[in-house]
């Protein structure tokens, strides 16, 4: 007889190798055929809603690792919620207007100057749709389950119509106004920019100290002094109309040789050192408030520079006397307005100085720095010129520096509802908690929102102008434009004349001749995506406002979190979200930002082609995503190894359940041995821990709990000793069926627990599980932890056993290294335990050979009675010797019972019995 044929070895067709790059696309096709998204919605119908609202990625180019991190995190949450009593629809979106699409077309050779705006916009729309399609396929490849056939896209007519309504509601409440004001201006884009469209980069700039002679001292100054200002933007000096000082600061009049200078007293030493003053003496001090309305002379133009008070003046740098150009700075503008100064802005859309800057007209602003500095030197006003490298705002798209420039723009008045915004921030749950402080401070400190852009590709600002220049925004015009956009799309604005966009028979007192013109500016793209709570959450039947969660990168505090909050509070008085969760950026393995120049860009597609989507998803679950995260080949290799262990666990479980029918073979919990019940306690602990971690979005805790359970609880302990029973005993032996009962519970629970993170693998495992009826594991619920009546006692006892087992394993390892034994089945062990361990060992003595995977086990005396040379550990002393007897051909246990059965001379007594009872006819 071939005894190896009598062993019940694992048997399964579940493949050992994942081969995910090939197998996942096939699984996704299967999901598409069975309409998995709709099936899940149907399955969860009638449950309470959980809405995670997708912040729309920008439709341009392939998805990057930041996109992958974001979408996969969202997918974890939505999948988990749909398995825990919620209906969790997920509608993906795309942001499709804006400059990058215009630039992409120009780069492709589109001659936009040779076509109408409407024609150019049609090309923009076509390009945007192509990009949506490209990204949609890449997101699907990640295994993200979403309503991919019905996304929201910001260029779609229904969306644009709702955006117009949001604008109209805000205008009706008086929150929209037109004003001349300095805004971030990009000369390279020739447009205003929102705060969210700028990024800071290092820039080399001139740093100059300039003297402004006093013209009228107002009886506070004698008239022979000079104010010193410091600036890094010499090109703004032609626009200088004043000098700001702080009312509470003390200022010194400092005599240096024959000159007298005015600076903040606190900065005396710094300025003296920088300007290399020797023998400088303070002849007088005055309070900043006393200097108000004194007048200085502009250094090279024949005009006054008024001295004003401003709280924005600090002593962090400079002189405490701040050059003030109301056309080129927010603080300058506010102070200038208070003192009635004009808003002088001698720079055009392209960043070129105009004839309002005599002597420098026609120069690009950056090129004007040198001649202006030379002019200052010529007139004796330049006290010092150096160069510094400092952090300076740049256009996030063109990567070129931007300027502050006063222009006529449309604004949303944040000031009008700032109090409500701050309250809404306080009512929202923020994860991480610092998000609340971050957005609170932004909302508290931000100026009004410049919502107009001087571009072609976007949603038009729905304003008309009467003959007398009055802007027209009424309920009637807004509703009519919204209806037109819903029917024809926003291109209709560029295809028709103003009168054809107005309601029929529309009149206005400012247009006695019935003539009107339309606004040519478009809305900031942040107004587009910021209106999604109205256009998507409110409009779609399967969603609701407020959403339960917004989840985006930490750059969205100033972006989508902010713009959505502003429009929602303006329109509804409430935040559009109940909770906000943010994640960090993806860096390379060394913690560097990914960039083409370094050549360290990791692309999701490459990972999926080489390793698979589930490996990428497992990486997402492994990182502390609330901070910046790292990815590299080495990191992915480690993750792939963890995946291999999880997959092998599934394969082992399936292999040992091949002959198990739950309905026929399952053993009642009360009839299980203690060690089996202990395993169920460990499983229930895992279920509790993993579900709590999912609830708090702590996916790294899920990852570690599942990995540890597979490697420590299962592989290193339960499955290791169970092999002796699973393979060796007869198919229906009660201990074997008991272990299979536990393995079955473990398999079903583990498959469900990993589903949100490893959906492809979970759905690959699912049909192999005996007795399952559901088409997909996604149509099931998370396992419930079952509290065993003796769970605490089992845990106390068996946790203690596990620590003692560690001592035994160490002793066996030492014996192996000293060549006392080969493998552990060659060993006979005698334990000399502590008093508390002795009673525990006596209660489970019959299982101990199997639990320690040795051939012979004896209980000696107490620990103090152990032989002097026996290794002593925390809980026991252990004597390891070679087991006596011969090795059984079938189970490899060393036994003195070999050959006792004459028919089976090479088998131990146990194996001979099993063979006779199960295999001998």
Swiss-Prot record:
Localization, UniProt: Cytoplasm
Pfam families from the UniProt entry: Anticodon_1, tRNA-synt_1, zf-FPG_IleRS
Annotated Zn(2+) binding sites: 888, 891, 908, 911
Disulphide-bridged cysteine pairs: none
Free-text comment on the cofactor: Binds 1 zinc ion per subunit.
Biological process annotations from GO: isoleucyl-tRNA aminoacylation
Superkingdom as given in the UniProt entry: Bacteria
Required cofactor(s): Zn(2+)
Matches recorded under InterPro entries: aa-tRNA-synth_I_CS (IPR001412), aa-tRNA-synth_Ia (IPR002300), Anticodon_Ile_BEm (IPR033708), Ile-tRNA-ligase (IPR002301), Ile-tRNA-ligase_type1 (IPR023585), Ile-tRNA_ligase (IPR050081), M/V/L/I-tRNA-synth_anticd-bd (IPR013155), Rossmann-like_a/b/a_fold (IPR014729)
Substrates-to-products reaction catalysed: tRNA(Ile) + L-isoleucine + ATP = L-isoleucyl-tRNA(Ile) + AMP + diphosphate
Keyword terms of this UniProt record: Aminoacyl-tRNA synthetase, ATP-binding, Cytoplasm, Ligase, Metal-binding, Nucleotide-binding, Protein biosynthesis, Zinc
Motif 'KMSKS' region, residue range(s) on this chain: 593-597
UniProt: L-isoleucyl-5'-AMP binding residues: 552
E.C. no: 6.1.1.5
Motif annotated as 'HIGH' region, chain positions: 57-67
Keyword S-adenosyl-L-methionine: no
GO CC, any one term: cytosol
Entry GO MF terms: aminoacyl-tRNA deacylase activity; ATP binding; isoleucine-tRNA ligase activity; tRNA binding; zinc ion binding
Residues noted as binding ATP in the record, renumbered to the chain: 596
Subunit details: Monomer.
Family: Belongs to the class-I aminoacyl-tRNA synthetase family. IleS type 1 subfamily.
Domain notes: IleRS has two distinct active sites: one for aminoacylation and one for editing. The misactivated valine is translocated from the active site to the editing site, which sterically excludes the correctly activated isoleucine. The single editing site contains two valyl binding pockets, one specific for each substrate (Val-AMP or Val-tRNA(Ile)).
Primary role: Catalyzes the attachment of isoleucine to tRNA(Ile). As IleRS can inadvertently accommodate and process structurally similar amino acids such as valine, to avoid such errors it has two additional distinct tRNA(Ile)-dependent editing activities. One activity is designated as 'pretransfer' editing and involves the hydrolysis of activated Val-AMP. The other activity is designated 'posttransfer' editing and involves deacylation of mischarged Val-tRNA(Ile).
Protein name: Isoleucine--tRNA ligase
Source organism: Bacillus cereus (strain G9842)
């Amino acid at each position: 007889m071939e005894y190896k044929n009598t062993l019940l070895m694992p048997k399964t067709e579940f493949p050992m190798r994942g081969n995910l790059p090939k197998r996942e696309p096939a699984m996704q096709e299967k999901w598409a055929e069975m309409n998995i998204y709709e099936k899940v919605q149907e399955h969860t119908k009638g449950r309470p809603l959980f809405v995670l609202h997708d912040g729309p990625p920008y439709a341009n180019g392939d998805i990057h690792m930041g996109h992958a991190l974001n979408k996969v995190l969202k997918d974890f949450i939505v999948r988990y919620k749909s398995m825990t009593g919620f209906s969790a629809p997920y509608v993906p979106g795309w942001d499709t207007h804006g400059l990058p699409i215009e630039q992409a077309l120009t780069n492709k050779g589109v001659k936009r100057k040779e076509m109408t705006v409407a024609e150019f916009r049609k090309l923009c729309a076509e390009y945007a749709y192509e990009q949506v399609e490209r990204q949609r396929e890449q997101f699907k490849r990640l295994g993200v389950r979403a309503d991919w056939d019905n996304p929201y896209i910001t260029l779609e007519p229904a969306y644009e119509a709702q955006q117009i309504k949001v604008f109209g509601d805000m205008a009706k409440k008086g929150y929209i106004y037109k004003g001349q004001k300095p805004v971030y201006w990009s000369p390279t884009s020739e447009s205003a920019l929102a705060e969210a469209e700028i990024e800071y980069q290092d820039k080399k700039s001139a740093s100059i100290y300039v003297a402004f002679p006093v013209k009228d001292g107002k009886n506070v100054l004698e008239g022979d002094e000079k104010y010193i200002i410091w600036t890094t933007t010499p090109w703004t000096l032609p626009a200088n109309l004043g000098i700001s000082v702080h009312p509470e600061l003390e200022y010194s009049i400092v005599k240096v040789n024959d000159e007298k200078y005015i600076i903040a007293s606190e900065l005396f030493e710094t300025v003296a050192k920088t300007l290399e003053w020797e023998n400088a003496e303070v002849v007088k001090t005055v309070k900043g408030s006393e200097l108000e309305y004194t007048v200085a002379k502009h250094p090279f133009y024949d005009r006054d520079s008024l001295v004003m008070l401003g709280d924005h003046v600090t002593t962090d740098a400079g002189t405490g006397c701040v050059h003030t150009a109301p056309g080129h700075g927010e603080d300058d503008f506010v102070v200038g307005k208070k003192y009635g100064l004009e808003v002088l802005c001698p720079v055009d859309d392209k960043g070129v100085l105009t004839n309002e800057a005599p002597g420098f007209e026609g120069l690009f602003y950056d090129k004007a720095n040198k001649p202006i500095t030379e002019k200052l030197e010529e007139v004796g006003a330049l006290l010092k010129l150096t160069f510094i490298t400092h952090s300076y705002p740049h256009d996030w798209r063109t990567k070129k520096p931007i300027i502050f420039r006063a222009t006529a723009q449309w604004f949303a008045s944040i000031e009008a509802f700032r109090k409500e915004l701050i309250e809404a921030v306080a009512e929202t749950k923020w994860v991480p908690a610092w998000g609340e402080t971050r957005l609170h401070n932004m909302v508290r400190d931000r100026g009004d929102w410049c919502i107009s852009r001087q571009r072609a590709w976007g949603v038009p600002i729905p304003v008309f102008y009467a003959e007398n220049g009055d802007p027209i925004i009424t309920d009637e015009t807004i509703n009519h434009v919204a209806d037109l956009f819903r029917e024809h799309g926003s291109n209709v604005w560029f295809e028709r004349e103003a009168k054809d966009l107005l309601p029929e028979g529309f009149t206005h007192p400012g247009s006695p001749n019935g003539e009107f013109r339309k606004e040519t500016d478009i809305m900031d793209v942040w107004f587009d995506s910021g209106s999604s709570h109205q256009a998507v959450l409110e409009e779609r039947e399967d969603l609701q406002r407020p959403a339960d969660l917004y989840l985006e990168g930490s750059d969205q505090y100033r972006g989508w979190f902010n713009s959505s909050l502003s429009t929602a509070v303006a329109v509804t008085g409430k935040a559009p979200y109940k909770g906000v969760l943010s994640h960090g950026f993806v860096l390379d393995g060394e913690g560097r930002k990914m960039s083409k120049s370094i050549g360290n860009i990791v692309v999701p597609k490459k990972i999926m082609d080489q390793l698979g989507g589930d490996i990428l998803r497992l990486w997402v679950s492994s990182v502390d995503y609330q901070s910046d995260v790292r990815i590299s080949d080495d990191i992915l290799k480690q993750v792939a190894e963890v995946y291999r262990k999880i997959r092998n666990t599934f394969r082992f479980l399936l292999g040992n359940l091949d002959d198990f029918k739950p309905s026929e073979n399952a053993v009642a919990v009360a009839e299980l041995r203690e060690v089996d019940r202990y395993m169920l306690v460990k499983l229930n602990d895992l279920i509790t821990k993993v579900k709590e971690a999912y609830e708090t979005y702590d996916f790294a805790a899920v990852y570690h709990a599942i990995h540890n359970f597979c490697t420590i609880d299962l592989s290193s302990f339960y499955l290791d000793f169970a092999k002796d029973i699973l393979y060796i005993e007869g198919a229906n032996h009660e201990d074997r069926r008991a272990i299979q009962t536990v393995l079955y519970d473990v398999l079903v629970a583990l498959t469900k627990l990993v589903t949100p993170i490893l959906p492809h693998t979970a759905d690959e495992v699912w049909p192999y599980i005996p007795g399952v009826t559901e088409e997909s594991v996604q149509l099931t619920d998370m396992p419930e932890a079952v509290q065993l009546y003796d769970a605490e006692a089992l845990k106390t006892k068996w946790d203690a056993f596990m620590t003692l087992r560690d001592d035994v394993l160490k002793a066996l390892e030492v014996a192996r290294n000293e060549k006392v034994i080969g493998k552990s089945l060659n060993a006979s062990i005698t334990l000399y335990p502590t008093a508390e361990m002795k009673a525990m060992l006596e209660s489970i003595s019959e299982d101990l050979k199997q639990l320690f995977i040795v051939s012979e086990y004896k209980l000696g005396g107490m620990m103090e009675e152990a032989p002097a040379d026996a290794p002593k550990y925390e809980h026991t002393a252990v004597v390891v010797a070679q087991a006596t007897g011969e090795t059984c051909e079938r189970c490899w246990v060393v036994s003195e019972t070999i050959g006792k059965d004459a028919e089976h001379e090479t088998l131990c007594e146990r194996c001979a019995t099993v063979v006779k009872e199960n295999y001998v006819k």
